[in-house]
Amino acid sequence: LFLTNTFGGNAARLKLHTAQGRVGELNRIGAELGREVADKAGRPVIVAGSMGPTGEIFEPMGTLTHALAVEIFHEQAEALKSGGVDVLWFETISAPEEYRAAADAALRADMPWCGTMSFDTAGRTMMGMTSAAMADMVERLVNPPIAFGANCGVGASDLMRTVLGFAATGTERPIIAKGNAGIPKYHDGHIHYDGTPELMAEYAVMARDAGVRIIGGCCGTMPEHLRAMRVALESRPKGNRPSLEVIQAKLGGFSSASDGTGDDAGAGRRERRGRRG
């Protein structure tokens, strides 16, 4: 499975480049390019139409409404569908309202969909949602995704903790893990992600052992990372579900003491309030 190069292809994002009128054209072409590559692969390859967030804030703090968000996503979804994608892939969502809009847009487009959120603030999304809350929300949707999970965030170890949070809910829905290749660092005039292929291979194996069904890489992930991940998954036997201690030992420490779930959830919230003060 791979994604089309259309992450920022909705009207709200293209408006920043005065290109909001080209949603149909750009997404259709992006989907066609992906379809062409997949069909030449010599093996089954699923083309997922990448759809990122609108970048807008929902009412009452902002101006975005549910109806408008659905309209924005539906326009992009129809263009990706016309270009030949197999599935819609919403990612890096932080607001539950936007995730619900994605579900309704996919239903309107009559397309299967997957949806991931980005957990990057003490194990929560930017809008405060925990892994447990997301899993609960997904099952309450009229049009739930065929798979759900987490992408991006602040590194593989934090993403793995989020994955364990999904698994702890007992969900039977396939889980997605799409972690960054390490942490971004500024070096010699450009941003460099410090995750090695070896680290991403460890992450991929641990994600599989944790019960994840769809494993990939987000920011900073290069062909050499993906190659190492695939070799590790194909050559290493399945193991037990990793503990938090094992994750930290192999992938590095967590960025916060709490992920907002479990016995330490209250402590995690108090710590964040203290830091803001």
Model-derived segments and spans:
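Domain-level signal for soluble alpha/beta catalytic cores
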Residues: L1-G277
